[in-house]
Amino acid sequence: MQHIKHMRTAVRLARYALDHDETPVACIFVHTPTGQVMAYGMNDTNKSLTGVAHAEFMGIDQIKAMLGSRGVVDVFKDITLYVTVEPCIMCASALKQLDIGKVVFGCGNERFGGNGTVLSVNHDTCTLVPKNNSAAGYESIPGILRKEAIMLLRYFYVRQNERAPKPRSKSDRVLDKNTFPPMEWSKYLNEEAFIETFGDDYRTCFANKVDLSSNSVDWDLIDSHQDNIIQELEEQCKMFKFNVHKKSKV
């Protein structure tokens, strides 16, 4: 499944963020027609001390730098965003206004989720959207490598965060590797959309509120340091940019 392939890349980038003292939330922007990675982002709130420096905005800035503001509007309908954690309400609104094609995410955002957990910004009718966007929303697919995304967040929150306004006592921080909340598919998809997305073989996952994969977590993926991920992504983004310029000259 292409979704798993691309989400693995996003998870690797989130692990890199964790190793650099950032909240482990990361994303990649994939050009859907070609399957090429065109931009990436990870949270930068700790380093920048900027509350809006979310992974999605970091990637959007890369696309703007590459294509210009007008180019962003033209290309976003052909982009699939893979992000380890459900976009917050702010990011979900920005993605909708940019007319993004699709969002695929790992785990829900229990406090600020904008794709179904708290609000369904991607489907509401009040957010401003481009005039040519008759659908007034975007498709959102949850639960891809969900447990891996949850575990990276747990790794972060059991650490001492010096920038937290009220640091928790170390004795209160216990790493849980065994239990996970139910996967509430119905918050994001109805059963018909779920089956259309994942296939009838997974129908019972919807009813039983369980993950698509087995109960195991890919520990190798989330426990390995990802020192080369930035270089890999930079090379992929350069290749996409090269192909864009090559096409524009034809």
From Swiss-Prot:
Its cofactor is Zn(2+). Zn(2+) binds at H54, C88, C91. GO terms for biological process: tRNA modification; tRNA wobble adenosine to inosine editing. It catalyses: adenosine(34) in tRNA + H2O + H(+) = inosine(34) in tRNA + NH4(+). It is an enzyme of class 3 (hydrolase). SUPFAM superfamilies: Cytidine deaminase-like. InterPro entries: APOBEC/CMP_deaminase_Zn-bd (IPR016192), CMP_dCMP_dom (IPR002125), Cytidine_deaminase-like (IPR016193). Structural subunit of tRNA-specific adenosine deaminase, which deaminates adenosine-34 (the first, also called wobble position of the anticodon) to inosine in many tRNAs. Inosine-34 allows the decoding of 3 different nucleotides at the third position of mRNA codons, as inosine is able to pair with U, C, and A. Present with 830 molecules/cell in log phase SD medium. This is tRNA-specific adenosine deaminase subunit TAD2.
